[in-house]
C-alpha cells in the first residue's frame, strides 16, 4: 500500500536557516519508512503518530550531526587546579600597581645607555678653551663600562656591527683625550679579532646609518694611528658602499627638508654646509633626536640650542646618553599596544587614555615619528598611532599613510627612502584592517604589506631590520592568518603571551631597549590574569552544561549539542569576571537559537512551527499540550529559561524586561517561519528580500539584545534605540554574519536540496552571471559591510560594552566560518584548538 509523498526537511549540519527536501515512502514489504535523499535512502522505524503529533517528528526523521567533541566527563573533571591562589591574587594586585606606576612615570622615554653616542658627546671640548672634555662624566662612563671582551655595547646582546661600531667610537674618543690606554688596547684587540664577523652577519643586522658613520670613523682612526685591520676586504667594501651612497644623495635634498640623514651627520662632516643644515634643527635643539649627530653639529657650529639639548639629555641620564631621545610617542604607543595584545588593558584604562591623549595632542596629518618634535615621520609609529587612536575613538584620517607611499604604490618606513622592515610592515598591515568605507589607501596598504610579509616568511634575514623580538615570525603568521575581523581578544592574548619577549631589543644607530615596552612584569601579569579568568570560565561552563541536561535537552535528537563551543564565543571577547551573567545569558540564548534553528529547519511541520511561534507570542504554557513531545521539551525549556532571565533582568535593569524579551523572540521566530514558508513553497527570493530576512534569522541580534541586559549598565531607551534591530550597527552585524555563513555552506546545502542562499538569490537576480561571480559579489558586499561595521564600532556613541557586544559578535562569526561550518563541524576544525586554548589549557 502506498501513501502520498510527504515533504519535510533535513539540515546539512549548518546553522543557516535553510532546508532540503526529504521524501518519505513506504519501504516495500516493510513497516519502515524510507527517507530518500537524492540517490540514497535510510530506514527509520515508523511509529503511528498520536493526535496532534507530527509525522515530521524525529521518530520519523533523525538528522545526523557530528557529536559534541567536549564530553561531560572532561568538563566535569575540571577542578580548576590552576586557580589563582591568595598569594597570586596579591601578586596580581602588586603587578597592576607597578605597571600603573610605569605608565605614570612615562616622560620623554626610558631607554638604555648608548656607548656609541656617549663617545661622541664625550668628544666635546671644554668651552673655556682648556684641553679637557666639556662633559668629563661621559669620559669616565666610557672608562668604567668596557665589557670583559674589550668591547663596548649591550653585554647581553651581541651583534657584530653594533659592538664594532660602539667600540670604534669609544677608542677614538679615549685616544683623543689621551686617556684609558689599557681600555684602548683591549678595544683595538677586540676590533682586530671580531671585525671579520661583520661579514658573516646579515645586512639587516646593520645599524641605521652604519655605512655612513663607520667608514668616516675608520678614516679618523687611521689618521690617529690606531692599529686596526684597515685592509680587510670587507672593510673596503663598506667604504665603497659609503661612497656610492653619497653620490646618490643630491646636495639640495640634504638641506631641502628633514630626512634620516640628519640622524648621521657625524658621518657626513666633510660634505655638510653647517650654516645651511641649521635650518633643519628640531625645536628641542637636536638633529633628529640623535645625541651623536647633535654633538657633531655643536662641535662644528657652537650652536647653543645643540648644547641645551645635550645638557637636557645628560640631566636625565647622568653620565651617559641613549642612541636617540626623546622617545615619548614611541614608548606610549607601544606600551598601550603591549597591554592590549596581552589582554590586560582593562586594568589600565585611565593610564591608556592619558597616554593616547598625549599622542593625539602631537598627532600630525603628515605622520609622526618616535618623538613629539621629531621632524621626520616614520610609518611604524604613524601606523601604530592611526590604528590605536582610531579604535579608541580619536578622529584620525588614513590619508596620513600617503606620506609613505611611493609612485609605484609601495610603502616604506621613511619618506623618500627604500628601507622597510618586517616590524613596520606588520604594523601597517594591522592598521590597514581598521579601515572605513572608501579608504582606498588602506586597501592598498593591506595588499602591499600582505605581499611583503608573506615573502618575508620565506626569508629568515628579513626578520631583523628594526627589532629583535622573541618570535616576530609567530606574530606575522598570526596576523596573516587571523586578521582584525577574525581575531578574538582571548585568542590574541594567548598567542601574544607565547610570542611576547620581555627582553626584546630594537636596532637604531645601536641596539637599544625600552623597559616600559619590553618588561617581565607585563608577561607575568598576563599569565596570572589569563589563568585566573580561565578558571572562572571553567566553572561557568560546568554550570551551563548542567543547565542543558536539567532542561531535558539531551533528549532532543534533532539538534546539535554545542554548549562548549557556544560558550567559547562570549568567553573569547567579554571575558572579564564582572560579565559572568552576560556570558551565561549569551550562551543560553545562543543555544536556543541553535535548537530553534534546527527545529524550524527540519523537525517541525509548518503547522507545528506556527503553533510554537504563537505560543511564544502569547507566552502561553497551556499550548504545550498540542505540541509533539520533542517540541514540548523545547518550549518548556525555553519558557522556564527566559522567565528566569527576565526575573534577573528586572533586578539588573530596575524595570520589567519580559515584554522586551518576548518582542525580541517574536521577531526572531517570524524570520524563521518566513524561511520555512519559502522552503515549503520552493521559493527563491530576490537578493535584497533574502538579505532583509536572513540578517535577522541568523539570530545574532536576538543574542545581543537579550545579553545586553546583563552588562552591569542600565539600558536606557536612548541606548536601546542605537542597538535595536533598526540600528545600522546591528544590521551590519547580522548581515556580515549571514554572508560569511553562506559563503562557507551554500555548496553543501545546495547539494542537499537547498533553494536559497545569498549566492543563489543573487544569481536569480542576475541570470547571466556565473556562480564564481556571484560568490565574488557576496564577498565584496561582506568586506564593504565589515568596513562600515568598523566605522559604526568606532563612531557609535554608546557605552563601550554594548559596542563590544555587537562588534565582537560579528567578529566571532568570521572566525567560526573561516574554513567552513565551524559550529557544526567544530571537531574537525581549528575551532577545537581555539576552545582548548581559551577554556581548558592554562598558560605556563
Curated annotation (Swiss-Prot):
Substrate binds at residues 245, 465. Mg(2+) 1 binds at residues 597, 601. It comes from the Eukaryota. Residues 1-46 form a transit peptide. Keywords: Chloroplast, Isomerase, Lyase, Magnesium, Metal-binding, Multifunctional enzyme, Plastid, Transit peptide. It catalyses: (2E,6E,10E)-geranylgeranyl diphosphate = (+)-copalyl diphosphate; (+)-copalyl diphosphate = abieta-7,13-diene + diphosphate; (+)-copalyl diphosphate = neoabietadiene + diphosphate; (+)-copalyl diphosphate = abieta-8(14),12-diene + diphosphate. A motif (DXDD motif) lies at residues 378-381. Its EC number is 4.2.3.18, 4.2.3.32, 4.2.3.132, 5.5.1.12. Pathway: Terpene metabolism; oleoresin biosynthesis. Transmembrane segments: none annotated. Its cofactor is Mg(2+). One of its GO terms (cellular component) is chloroplast. Mg(2+) 3 binds at residues 741, 745, 749. GO terms for molecular function: abietadiene synthase activity; copalyl diphosphate synthase activity; levopimaradiene synthase activity; magnesium ion binding; terpene synthase activity. Belongs to the terpene synthase family. Tpsd subfamily. The Asp-Xaa-Asp-Asp (DXDD) motif is important for the catalytic activity in the class II active site relevant for the cyclization of GGPP. The Asp-Asp-Xaa-Xaa-Asp/Glu (DDXXD/E) motif is important for the catalytic activity in the class I active site, presumably through binding to Mg(2+). Monomer. This is Bifunctional abietadiene synthase, chloroplastic. The lineage of its organism: Eukaryota, Viridiplantae, Streptophyta, Embryophyta, Tracheophyta.
Amino acid at each position: 500500500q502506498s501513501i502520498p509523498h510527504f515533504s519535510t526537511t533535513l539540515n546539512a549540519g549548518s546553522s543557516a536557516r535553510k532546508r532540503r527536501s526529504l521524501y518519505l515512502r513506504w519501504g516495500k514489504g516493510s513497516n519502515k519508512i524510507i527517507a530518500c535523499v537524492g540517490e540514497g535512502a535510510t530506514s527509520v522505524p515508523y511509529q503511528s503518530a498520536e493526535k496532534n503529533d507530527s509525522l515530521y517528528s524525529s521518530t520519523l526523521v533523525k538528522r545526523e550531526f557530528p557529536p559534541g567533541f567536549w564530553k561531560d566527563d572532561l568538563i566535569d573533571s575540571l577542578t580548576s587546579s590552576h586557580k589563582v591562589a591568595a598569594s597570586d591574587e596579591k601578586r596580581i594586585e602588586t603587578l597592576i600597581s607597578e605597571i600603573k606606576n610605569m605608565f605614570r612615570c612615562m616622560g620623554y622615554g626610558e631607554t638604555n645607555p648608548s656607548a656609541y653616542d656617549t663617545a661622541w658627546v664625550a668628544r666635546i671640548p671644554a668651552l673655556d678653551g682648556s684641553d679637557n672634555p666639556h662633559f668629563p662624566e661621559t669620559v669616565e662612563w666610557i672608562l668604567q663600562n668596557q665589557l670583559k671582551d674589550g668591547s663596548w655595547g649591550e653585554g647581553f646582546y651581541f651583534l657584530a656591527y653594533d659592538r664594532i661600531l660602539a667600540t670604534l667610537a669609544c677608542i677614538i674618543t679615549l685616544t683623543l683625550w689621551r686617556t684609558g690606554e689599557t681600555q684602548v688596547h683591549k678595544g683595538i684587540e677586540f676590533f682586530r679579532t671580531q671585525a671579520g664577523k661583520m661579514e658573516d652577519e646579515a645586512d639587516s643586522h646593520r645599524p641605521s646609518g652604519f655605512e655612513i658613520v663607520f667608514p668616516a670613523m675608520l678614516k679618523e682612526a687611521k689618521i690617529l694611528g690606531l692599529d686596526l685591520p684597515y685592509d680587510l676586504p670587507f672593510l673596503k667594501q663598506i667604504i665603497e658602499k659609503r661612497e656610492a651612497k653619497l653620490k646618490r644623495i643630491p646636495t639640495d635634498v640634504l638641506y631641502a627638508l628633514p630626512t634620516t640623514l640628519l640622524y648621521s651627520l657625524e658621518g657626513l662632516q666633510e660634505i655638510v654646509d653647517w650654516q645651511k643644515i641649521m635650518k633643519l634643527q628640531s625645536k628641542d635643539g637636536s638633529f633628529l633626536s640623535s645625541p651623536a649627530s647633535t654633538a657633531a653639529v655643536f662641535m662644528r657650529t657652537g650652536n647653543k640650542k645643540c648644547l641645551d639639548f645635550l645638557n637636557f639629555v645628560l640631566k636625565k641620564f647622568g653620565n651617559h646618553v641613549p642612541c636617540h631621545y626623546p622617545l615619548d610617542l614611541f614608548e606610549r604607543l607601544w606600551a598601550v599596544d603591549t597591554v592590549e595584545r596581552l589582554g590586560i588593558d582593562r586594568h589600565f584604562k585611565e593610564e591608556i587614555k592619558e597616554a593616547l591623549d598625549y599622542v593625539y595632542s602631537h598627532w600630525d596629518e603628515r605622520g609622526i615619528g618616535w618623538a613629539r618634535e621629531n621632524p621626520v615621520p616614520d610609518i611604524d609609529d604613524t601606523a601604530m598611532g592611526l590604528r590605536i587612536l582610531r579604535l579608541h575613538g580619536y578622529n584620525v584620517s588614513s590619508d596620513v599613510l600617503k606620506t609613505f607611499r611611493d609612485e609605484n604604490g609601495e610603502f616604506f618606513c621613511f619618506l623618500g627612502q627604500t628601507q622597510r622592515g618586517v616590524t613596520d610592515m606588520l604594523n601597517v598591515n594591522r592598521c590597514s584592517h581598521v579601515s572605513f568605507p572608501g579608504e582606498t589607501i588602506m586597501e592598498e596598504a593591506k595588499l602591499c604589506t600582505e605581499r611583503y610579509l608573506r615573502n618575508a616568511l620565506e626569508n629568515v634575514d628579513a626578520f631583523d631590520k628594526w627589532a629583535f623580538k622573541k618570535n616576530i615570525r609567530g606574530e606575522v603568521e598570526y596576523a596573516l592568518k587571523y586578521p582584525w575581523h577574525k581575531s578574538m581578544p582571548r585568542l590574541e592574548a594567548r598567542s601574544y603571551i607565547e610570542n611576547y619577549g620581555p627582553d626584546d631589543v630594537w636596532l637604531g644607530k645601536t641596539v637599544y631597549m625600552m623597559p616600559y615596552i619590553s618588561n617581565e612584569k607585563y608577561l607575568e601579569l598576563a599569565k596570572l590574569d589569563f589563568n585566573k579568568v580561565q578558571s572562572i570560565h571553567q566553572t561557568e561552563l560546568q554550570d551551563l552544561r548542567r543547565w542543558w541536561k536539567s532542561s531535558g535537552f539531551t533528549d532532543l535528537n534533532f539538534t546539535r549539542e554545542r554548549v562548549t563551543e557556544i560558550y567559547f564565543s562570549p568567553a573569547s571577547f567579554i571575558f572579564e569576571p564582572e560579565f559572568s551573567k552576560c556570558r551565561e545569558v549569551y550562551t543560553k540564548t545562543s543555544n536556543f537559537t541553535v535548537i530553534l534553528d534546527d527545529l524550524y529547519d527540519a523537525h517541525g511541520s509548518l503547522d507545528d512551527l506556527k503553533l510554537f511561534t504563537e505560543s511564544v507570542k502569547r507566552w502561553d504554557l497551556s499550548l504545550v499540550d498540542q505540541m509533539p513531545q520533542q517540541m514540548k521539551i523545547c518550549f518548556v525549556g525555553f519558557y522556564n529559561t527566559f522567565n528566569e532571565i527576565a526575573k534577573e533582568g528586572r533586578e539588573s535593569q530596575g524595570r520589567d524586561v519580559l515584554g522586551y524579551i518576548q518582542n525580541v523572540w517574536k521577531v526572531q521566530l517570524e524570520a524563521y517561519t518566513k524561511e520555512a514558508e519559502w522552503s515549503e513553497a520552493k521559493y527563491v527570493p530576490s537578493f535584497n528580500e533574502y538579505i532583509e530576512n536572513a540578517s535577522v534569522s541568523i539570530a545574532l541580534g536576538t543574542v545581543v539584545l537579550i545579553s545586553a541586559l546583563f552588562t552591569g549598565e542600565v539600558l536606557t531607551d536612548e541606548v536601546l534605540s542605537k542597538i535595536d534591530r533598526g540600528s545600522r550597527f546591528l544590521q551590519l552585524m547580522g548581515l556580515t554574519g549571514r554572508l560569511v555563513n553562506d559563503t562557507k555552506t551554500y555548496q553543501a546545502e545546495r547539494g542537499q536540496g537547498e533553494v536559497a542562499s545569498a549566492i543563489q538569490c543573487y544569481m536569480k537576480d542576475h541570470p547571466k552571471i556565473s556562480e564564481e561571480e556571484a560568490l565574488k559579489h557576496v564577498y565584496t558586499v561582506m568586506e564593504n559591510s565589515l568596513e562600515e561595521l568598523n566605522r559604526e564600532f568606532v563612531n557609535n556613541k554608546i557605552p563601550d560594552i554594548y559596542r563590544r557586544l555587537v562588534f565582537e559578535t560579528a567578529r566571532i562569526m568570521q572566525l567560526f566560518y573561516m574554513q567552513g561550518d565551524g559550529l557544526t563541524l567544530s571537531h574537525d576544525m581549528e575551532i577545537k584548538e581555539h576552545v582548548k586554548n581559551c577554556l581548558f589549557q592554562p598558560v605556563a
